Amino acid sequence: MAQIDPPADALVGDWLTLPEAADRLGIPPGRLKQLFRDRKLLAVQRPDGTMAVPAAFFDGGGSIIKGLHGTLTVLLDCGFGDGEALRWLFTADDTLPGTPIQAMTERRGTEVNRRAQALAF
């Protein structure tokens, strides 16, 4: 898992530790590793050394937001590392408007994926 720098850490804002993320999903902490391997979820090492998951990756019902897996797959297939993908998801994009992660929480994942796919060209 990637380590991120303080500016990227600040972009995200709210974080969940791995035990908190597992609790939010209602699964044992060990199952998170499979979600990371399957690219359904992304965790990074924060500047303070803790492993964490952005809280924005979860909806109000305790599930991973719709479309995150597909977007992560597209970004990683484009050659992004975990830290770069995280930074892209939380950086404002005037064409959306807002950040890609905000658009995904508003069910505009198709728009986000189109922009992510365009990065490959």
Label every model-predicted segment.
Residues M1-F121:
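Non-transmembrane "mature" sequence context
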